[in-house]
Amino acid sequence: MSGAESYRHITVLLNEAVDALAVREDGVYVDGTFGRGGHSRLILSRLGDAGRLIVFDKDPQAIAVAEELARSDKRVGVVHGGFASFQTALDGLGIGKVDGALFDLGISSPQIDDGSRGFSFRFDAPLDMRMDTTRGMSAAEWIAVASEQDLHEVIKNYGEERFSRQIVRAIVAQRAESPIDTTRKLAQIVAQNVRTRERGQDPATRTFQAIRIFINRELEEVGAVLPQVMCRLKEGGRLAVIAFHSLEDRIVKQFVKKYSQHEPLPSWAAVREADLPEPPLKIVGRALKPGEAEIAANPRARSAVLRVAERTAGPIPE
């Protein structure tokens, strides 16, 4: 078993997310977060010979799995990079409109469970946290140079951590003496400065989440890709997004809401809402969460939320 496959990953909302795409046999689809290919393989099983699937991932280990799949299935195209490059990547592959796009946001189980990646406080390892280990600044490098204000804003805003001030003061004091370059060092600093404990949650959870989100620009990428997908979806094409925490889910929810309804017209407007063109998106069903059986089999699925939207014939506002 290769290193890329040695950590088990259970795909969350597998059938629900792929069902939401309403896969057409000859369609062109995008899996913006390939991971270990759970969603991608199910999409491929529903595509005919003329169908096509483009997969994105930042993680070199995920890309190794994707490229192996592409060697055995010519319908698959692989993009090593973040999904914020959605339109540029499709242009490079000669692809115009697509029939659907799926995004399973956040961190994958193999990334968490591979202690050497530095995502988890459960292991003592170099403090890295990069999804793409071939580029960018590691968490340890950023912590070494970030201002106290930047540290505070990241931990407070991305981790929603009540004790961010205390944690940051301790980080600044510690790094003046020695580098904070391992997961254990950071976790110990946090634990010493979080005064109350949330049931079933390690005190380092929020701080690690915050730094990971910042290092990988996760929220910025979500905000950047959604309008690109809307522009590239064919009429009737579907967007399906699985989010795992409130910050990213809020971005998705607000985007879909904004483009699935009209702005309220002022009372003096000469035009009626009924005369306006339909909005470019329509919401498909309600937000879907995993059932009890899935959560029992995979506790990490507990916080997942699936939202789905469909492209209409309506124009995209400028």
From Swiss-Prot:
Signal peptide: none annotated. Its EC number is 2.1.1.199. One of its GO terms (molecular function) is rRNA (cytosine-N4-)-methyltransferase activity. It holds the Pfam family Methyltransf_5. Keywords: Cytoplasm, Methyltransferase, rRNA processing, S-adenosyl-L-methionine, Transferase. It is found in: Cytoplasm. S-adenosyl-L-methionine binds at residues 37-39, 57, 83, 104, 111. It catalyses: cytidine(1402) in 16S rRNA + S-adenosyl-L-methionine = N(4)-methylcytidine(1402) in 16S rRNA + S-adenosyl-L-homocysteine + H(+). GO terms for biological process: rRNA base methylation. GO terms for cellular component: cytoplasm. It comes from the Bacteria. InterPro entries: RsmH, SAM-dep_MeTrfase_MraW_recog, SAM-dependent_MTases_sf. It is an enzyme of class 2 (transferase). Specifically methylates the N4 position of cytidine in position 1402 (C1402) of 16S rRNA. HAMAP family: 16SrRNA_methyltr_H. Belongs to the methyltransferase superfamily. RsmH family. This is Ribosomal RNA small subunit methyltransferase H. It comes from Neisseria gonorrhoeae (strain NCCP11945). The gene is rsmH.
